[in-house]
Amino acid sequence: MASTLPIPDINVIAPSFIQRDSQNSDNMKPPPTDFNHPYTPYPIQTAFMQTLYSVLDRTVAVSPPTTTNSTNNTAPSATFSSTAATLIPSNPSTSPSTPPLINPTTAPTVHLADRATEPSLSVTPRTTTSKDKDKGPSSSSSVPKGHAQIALFESPTGTGKSLSLICGSLTWLRNHKRLQFDSEIEKIQQQMEASGEPEWMVESAIKRKREELAQKYEEMERTLERIRQKEREMEKEGEEGQARGGKRRKLDRGKGDEEKGGKKKESGGSRGLTASDEDKEFLIGDWRDEGGLDENDPMGQLSKETRELLEKVGMGTAGGKKEANEGPVAEEEIKIFYTSRTHSQLTQFIQELRRPEFPASVPTPNPQEKPAKEIVKQIPLSSRQKLCINPTVNKLGTLAAINERCQSLQQPKTPKDQRCPYLPNAANLKATHEFRDTALATLPDIEDLYQTGKQLQICPYYASRAAIPGAEVITLPYPLLLQKSAREALGIRLEGNIVIIDEAHNIMDAVSNVHAAEIKYTDLKRAKLSLGMYYQRFHQKLTGENKVMVAQLQRVVEALGVYLKTKLDKAALGLKADQEGIVLDTSLLLKTGGADQINLYKLIRYVQESKLAFKIEGYISYCEEEGRDTDDEEAETEIKARQGRPPVLHTLCSFLTALTNLSSEGRIFYEKIPPPRGELQDMKLSYMLLSPTHAFSSIAESARAVILAGGTMSPFEDYKAHLFPDVPPEKITTLSCGHVIPPDNLCVWTLGSIAPNPKVDTGIGEDCFDFTFAKRSNPNMINRLGLVLLNLCSVVPDGVVAFFPSYGYLEEVIGVWKTHEQAMGPKTIWERLESKKALFIDSKTESSEQTLQKYSDVIHSEVRPLSPAGSRVKGAMLLSVIGGKMSEGINFSDRLGRCVVVVGMPYPNPHSPEWLARREYLEANFIKRYTASQQTSTATAPLPAPVIPPPSNTTHYSTNPSSSRNKDKHKPANVRKLAARDSHQFYENATLRAVNQSIGRAIRHQNDYAAIVLIDNRFEKEHVRAKLPGWIREGWDETQRQAKEDGKALKGLQGMMGRVNMFFRGKN
């Protein structure tokens, strides 16, 4: 029987969840109890950090209690099977299907995987030839087996999630480094003792080795400390403005850049050109010259001298030379790659990273000395759009244009005096090293990095790579991590490293979005005109092969344009099938002019390597600035109309790239789109990734651990089924934390009808709230909804935020409320609401920042504002949209969000082509995997879960196909039914995640309080509530318990108002 190692009691009794094999206890160490947290952590934070530590350390662990509300804090007994290397709970039948929950007053429940086996991380790269490039990617659809340990963490906002991630992961990393150090010393000691050397020689050798290992570390720390001291002195003297903890610097990237950077010759100017100069600037050269790009070499566009220098200073690709790197910070060790959705979230994370202090990676030579502290070495990575300091390049605006221009300035054929002066070179090598050391010494964010680059006159985008080998934490936005090509361009290798994805509730959509592409008919018209103008000017000077390739691109543009024009003409006739749909046969897209015979892989490679898009866009821009006349009236119109629009050929190239990467996981759609004011109707083609599985597999297969964390991650099943379908269940850990607020700070109510016992009519109770797509437009129900909000506004102080399924439906609801109904009295619902609170609407067309500011000003105003009728109102109500601008990234803490109301569930349109295509894919994939699992004695991959919607009286159910009650479900017809249910579950889960994100806008810290009201009869179904965050479910249970004790009605408007009124009375 395994021995139990309990978690220390911190204000609560927490069960043990880490167990060691008594026969091999030396190799199985429990997580520490001290995580260098800047303040005494909550018990849930301790459990979070210990779980994270164990995942990274691959510690063997078991599943503790399966119920979250039990008062019994004793851990269940477990047995360890050394043969199978798995831990078996004493009662496996009670294992929950929903993620475990931790809260401050109940026992933590953790599912930890077996950590006994260390996977192999070796990767054998495939050599790609130029012929391979022209043929395109392999058609193999198999997903590589994942090596990473996987952990899914849910921790509500305000519970210290960021600090828990920081302290848990960096404590493990520093301990890991110290163990490596000790291992080296122990190795020397064993070698010396085995050789029979005298004890004094053994001690001397160990001392020399210890000093040798510590020397490089000490040199680096001294260098970084000198930089930090210099930074402190500069801040004190006011040379850097306000101190680091103060207001962020606002960077002027406009004319000021040109003035501040004026001491260097700016590259890229090309106005007032002669015909000869135009040829040099815009004419395509021989794209197969030695300067041509290798798509597997992200630095292939740079000159030979530049590549050699970047590799020398550690800024080459992952496989580049590093042994020549100067300075003490070149060796690469295990790193933590942290990513989040926005740069502001990354900045907030870096601010949190500055708070804790961690022990040094190398122990002090004298055991009596106080352990040394070591600053965390972090480097933020970003795109050229955020980091470029060359004013002639960053003024281009769009990322594609900036990338093309930057690469163009570094081509081998570009004269040296026209290359970017900020790129690292032999002349500014000292500045490059100073940039690297400054970055590692100061925990910078993106704005700090940009400012440092400007001060040192060195490119932050390239110079930041020099800091990667010495960094412990690398922060970067979603696109740079999720796209394999972006990682390769930055020289990032995930093999053996730790990946932490924060705000991961939308990670599946994020993966799909970074691989999406679209192009409009108007874009194709612009591309055709641009190509025509360019060809007319330069066709006599183009080489034969260049003429062929440009002509091929023209044919492709013409074919795509004809396809969309045909659809647009049919759509004008009112045919519904031609308004939107799926392109079932993609060969039809290029049918015109024989474009379907063109090798698109080769054409795209040509466009990328020849810089054709940049040269054409540059020439059109030049004609615009010069006011040059053309013989083509349409071309003149194109020149005038292109201002402020993204470069069309970059858009085209992105779409063609998606077109060549078609697989079973992607589809092409066409859709008629509403035109901007004053313009003609338009039609677009779009590529959508139906599943993120294959695109995400390159991360899951290589990292040491992949951590998905968020405030509202529930339900968890989809992450397992669609991101990690081939990862064994024992390698996946899930943890759901409760909130830090006391139970009486939260009131949760589900309102399915306005009456306690709704009357029943034909299919729907006449008092029920049914916001399904087919029934939500019922004006009587919309008015009943208005009455509910009117009652809430009467008792809720300060701010009320109501979320609706869509902007369109919000407009519809407001329209009904503004319509006078005789039965509702002399005033409309809208007028009555205005008499209670100031009303604000989240609109697609208005700035969310301005709306939020006005809403906040009213709530915090000392003088109660006047309503349109002249009466004084108390507080304000904001009408917003689930998944809209106000539902994510904005905090309605304290008075701004005393009540959050969710109206309906934002299911997508069930008849949209995108939904139909994804449903078809999910069901086909389910059947394929289900069939494969039945054809072998052991399933080749875990089935997506959940499979069958649970019964109404339970949240836990079995998906075991061998169950006697499911004998007939292997029949094809029944399997199809299971597949349909599975696809429905996917969309229900996605819908609930969006709802959960909106709910999470309230309750932002320990002392905050709010009421949460969910209005729709579907919220009263237990299997729907089971997909809400654990702390919301517990809040609902507590509210129901209190209502019973008070003897109030348990359902309907009366029951809700009684409970909500009582809740806020207790807060006054």
Curated annotation (Swiss-Prot):
Its main location: nucleus. Belongs to the DEAD box helicase family. DEAH subfamily. DDX11/CHL1 sub-subfamily. This is ATP-dependent DNA helicase chl1. It catalyses: Couples ATP hydrolysis with the unwinding of duplex DNA at the replication fork by translocating in the 5'-3' direction. This creates two antiparallel DNA single strands (ssDNA). The leading ssDNA polymer is the template for DNA polymerase III holoenzyme which synthesizes a continuous strand; ATP + H2O = ADP + phosphate + H(+). GO terms for biological process: establishment of sister chromatid cohesion; nucleobase-containing compound metabolic process. Residues 85-96, 137-146, 933-942 have a biased composition (Low complexity). Keywords: ATP-binding, Cell cycle, DNA-binding, Helicase, Hydrolase, Iron, Iron-sulfur, Isomerase, Metal-binding, Nucleotide-binding, Nucleus. Binds 1 [4Fe-4S] cluster. Its cofactor is [4Fe-4S] cluster. [4Fe-4S] cluster binds at residues 388, 406, 420, 459. Residues 943-952 have a biased composition (Pro residues). Residues 85-147, 228-282, 933-974 are annotated as: Disordered. Residues 228-242, 253-268 have a biased composition (Basic and acidic residues). ATP binds at residues 155-162. The gene is chl1. It is found in: Nucleus. SMART domains: DEXDc2, HELICc2. It is an enzyme of class 5 (isomerase). It comes from the Eukaryota. One of its GO terms (cellular component) is nucleus. InterPro entries: ATP-dep_Helicase_C, DinG/Rad3-like, Helic_SF1/SF2_ATP-bd_DinG/Rad3, Helicase-like_DEXD_c2, P-loop_NTPase, RAD3-like_helicase_DEAD, Rad3/Chl1-like. Residues 31-556 form the Helicase ATP-binding domain. One of its GO terms (molecular function) is DNA helicase activity. Residues 119-128, 953-964 have a biased composition (Polar residues). Its EC number is 5.6.2.3. Signal peptide: none annotated. A motif (DEAH box) lies at residues 502-505.
